[in-house]
């Protein structure tokens, strides 16, 4: 659902040493740490005081995925982004996920804690509704853009 740096990350190794490691262990450790920070924010922010434990868990995912950044495919010169099938919502952003006053939800999503449109592989058109919830006293304006994404075949 998210991407994080996982290549040549400085990691702890046996014997009180450090070395550059690559793989999902490095990427998942970063996402887990950022998720813990978002969970702390949701647990302590008065804006979420009335939420149930399940709702707070969903908020963590909503903030993580809703503030992630699309990743451009470095093998292409046209700036095309990687498909969400490869990188999920995009590159996780710790600062945005822990400070954003707005989080998205998708009405009718297969999993309410995942702000994404489940399009499947059908050939029909799709309609979905994205709600943006503002937990601050400041108004925010967003512009919706779109880009068709596909896998390199």
Regions found by a protein language model. Name each.
Residues 4-78:
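Hydrolase catalytic cores
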Residues 49-50, 80-153:
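Secreted peptidase-domain scaffold signal
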């Amino acid at each position: 659902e998210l991407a994080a740096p996982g290549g040549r990350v400085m990691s702890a190794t046996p014997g009180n040493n450090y070395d550059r490691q690559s793989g999902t262990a490095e990427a998942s450790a970063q996402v887990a740490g950022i998720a813990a920070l978002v969970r702390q924010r949701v647990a302590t922010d008065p804006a979420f005081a009335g939420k149930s434990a399940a709702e707070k868990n969903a908020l963590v995912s909503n903030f993580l995925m809703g503030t992630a950044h699309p990743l451009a495919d470095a093998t292409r010169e046209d700036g095309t982004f990687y498909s969400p099938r490869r990188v999920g919502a995009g590159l996780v952003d710790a600062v945005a996920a822990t400070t954003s006053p707005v989080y998205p939800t998708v009405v009718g999503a297969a999993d309410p804690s995942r702000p994404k449109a489940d399009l499947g592989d059908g050939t029909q058109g799709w309609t979905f509704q994205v709600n943006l919830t503002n937990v601050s006293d400041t108004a925010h304006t967003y512009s919706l853009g779109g880009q068709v994404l596909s896998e390199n075949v």
